[in-house]
Amino acid sequence: MSDNFTESKNKIWHRRQLLQLGFSGAFMITTGTMWQMLNSKNYASVKIPPMKITASNGATNPMQVLRDFDYGTIKQENGRTVREFRLIAGTSTIQLNSAVSYNIWDLNGRIPGPTLRAKEGEKIRILFLNNAGHSHSLHFHGVHPAEMDGIKPIGNGKATIYEFDAEPYGVHLYHCHVAPVTRHVAKGLYGMFIIDPPKPRPPADEIVLIMSGYDVNDDNRNEYYAFNGVPHHYMHHPIQIYQNQLIRAYVLNIIEFDPAVTFHLHANFFDVYPSGMTMTPSVKTDVLTMGVAERHILEFAFKYPGKYMFHPHQDAIAESGCMGQFEVIAMKQT
């Protein structure tokens, strides 16, 4: 990393300057990153059903979002591990159903944005380029200096660098913080940020579930809702998991315009790790109330094969797109 790049973390960069430093579209996230954790020694015992990648629905593919963790690029600087991520805000169109399309802002061409993942204590560097036509920023939940809080707007065609230590461990999020924040978040500028604890959690099939809403007619009321970007996707394309295998779900509620929703799992109960900041669960339940930006780790395993629904227990929200199914399948004996 060149000195001028390292020392410029508080500056706003123009697109040409970032391109000169290697900030090009070539870094776009690939599905290969999703297997980095599962292929590690600690996760060797975890079996994942063959993934059925469905056709992309505009700006996102919920099946790829489900198990896709972006671990960034690891570097060593002055004896410290630096984990570098690159995010580009852009514009695209998502198909909410066969008749309704919606213009959104996206991050790295997808909604929700990439699920960033690091380990507690690492130094995090976020290279952010705004190509979305309006001023935007990235605000990360967690602990960091004020100048890294992502409040300052970054103009269209410009970029900036956020640097901070990964702390504390848990399930966090990032989102645009330019007013009106509700609109910028609701139109797609958000993602999950996982900081793993120093001691790894037990092996599990890990999935990401982000609840969101769409106000398509600007009346401050959502007409559509979704898990991982696309309404009803996991109802039409159930999430396959193996019978009796531990599932670790990182669940985030980012639904704007609704004060709170619940997460409900059919025919089962889950252990709750509040904000992912504990190593032992606080409660076991089958329905959990979550305010906007609230997130938790939920762990469970299914005893019986079959298809089981999950959804908010505000049924109007569920029936407007925020529902899905787990398809529990027996693991073949080898």
Regions found by a protein language model. Give the residues of each.
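Low-complexity, Pro/Ser/Thr- and charge-rich linker/hinge segments at domain boundaries
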Residues: I194-M211, A330-T334
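N-terminal secretory signal peptides
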Residues: M1-Q17, L21-G32
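Short amphipathic
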Residues: R83-G90, D205-M211
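Histidine- and aromatic-enriched segments that form or immediately flank copper-ligand environments
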Residues: E84-F193, D258-M290, H311-F326
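C-terminal segment of N-terminal export signals and the immediately downstream linker at the start
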Residues: K11, G32-V82, T334
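Acidic-aromatic/histidine active-site loop/patch
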Residues: V208-Q243
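Short, glycine/small-residue-enriched coil/turn segments at secondary-structure junctions
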Residues: Q76-E77, I111-I124, Y234-L246
